[in-house]
Amino acid sequence: MSQPFVLAVPSKGRLQENAEAFFARAGLTLAKSGGARDYRGTIVGLDNVEVAYLSASEIAANLARGSVHFGVTGEDLIRESIVDADKRVALIDGLGFGRADVVVAVPQAWIDVRTMADLDDVTTGFRAQHNRRMRVATKYINLTRGFFASHGVVDYRIVESAGATEGAPAVGTAELIVDITTTGATLAANGLRVLDDGVMLRSQANLVASREADWTDATRETARIILDHIASRARAGKFKEVRTRFSGCNDALLAEAHAKFGVVSPFGGPTSSGMLTLHCPPAQLYGLSSFLRGHGAETVSVVSLDYVMDRENPLFAKLEAFLRS
């Protein structure tokens, strides 16, 4: 048997639940043959696929090494832990969960420090006054260095944080922090605020592909099938299917509907009997149905879509372009 296609997903908590739900919505059911405590699984109905349950940081490391083909992990971990990430991995698709911003946060008492330029001035003055560099507590060492360098901030020292980073200024181990936040409530509770231009990265969970993985014809085909499921589900989420039939339905009316409502005609124009199927953005449904009824339609039905499968697969095309580059 050939080497399996390996998909790495988070091993616990909300990230695992969200990842499994994401794949399930795309028609890809992840199953653990050994029960909930098993760290290996499969995708039901797909042969020679191994699902590896790992921590988010382990997933990033395995993607860098090429020991997994696809992994679900946060962009923040990819950017922090993989040098030249854009050359070694591809962010195939943002999954819409695990959202968090990597930010620069300073004490609320620093009323004159609103931007990174202000911080540059303060760090220079701090060193002159205290004969030491200002301390920045963070787990994101590489992201911090890159972001600070891009803003010309050099008079600082990183204090690597192993725990609750937001508490570092209060206990005196750092003057400011770089950390992740979702709502900012924890920062505010610790007397901190984000600089106006201090959002370093808006992160979310991504489906990530590794360049170093063993990309055979078989594993590429497995990737195509997985990405076809995901793209089909995503495409379906953008539209509702609208059906109607009336004698006044013609190509000119269809062209007007396209222009006004952004509809797609997946099966072409109206049939000889006036039967028409359209895919319509949800926000345009009422306007479209009123338009069709105003031109003679007696009945307009609306159907939710589970999958819309096109010949073109933009996600697989993105993967192929990355592997060729």
Curated annotation (Swiss-Prot):
Q: Which family does it belong to?
A: Belongs to the ATP phosphoribosyltransferase family. Long subfamily.
Per the entry, what this protein does is: Catalyzes the condensation of ATP and 5-phosphoribose 1-diphosphate to form N'-(5'-phosphoribosyl)-ATP (PR-ATP). Has a crucial role in the pathway because the rate of histidine biosynthesis seems to be controlled primarily by regulation of HisG enzymatic activity.
Reaction equation(s) it catalyzes:
1-(5-phospho-beta-D-ribosyl)-ATP + diphosphate = 5-phospho-alpha-D-ribose 1-diphosphate + ATP
Q: Which GO terms describe its molecular function?
A: ATP binding; ATP phosphoribosyltransferase activity; magnesium ion binding
Full protein name: ATP phosphoribosyltransferase
The pathway to which it is assigned is:
Amino-acid biosynthesis; L-histidine biosynthesis; L-histidine from 5-phospho-alpha-D-ribose 1-diphosphate: step 1/9
Localization per record = Cytoplasm
Chief place where the protein resides: cytoplasm
Q: What is this enzyme's EC? A: 2.4.2.17
Cellular component aspect of the GO annotation: cytoplasm
Per its Swiss-Prot or TrEMBL entry, what cofactor is needed? Mg(2+)
Q: How is its activity regulated?
A: Feedback inhibited by histidine.
Could you state one GO biological process linked to this protein?
A: L-histidine biosynthetic process
Q: Report keywords, A-Z.
A: Amino-acid biosynthesis, ATP-binding, Cytoplasm, Glycosyltransferase, Histidine biosynthesis, Magnesium, Metal-binding, Nucleotide-binding, Transferase
What species does this protein belong to? Rhodopseudomonas palustris (strain BisA53)
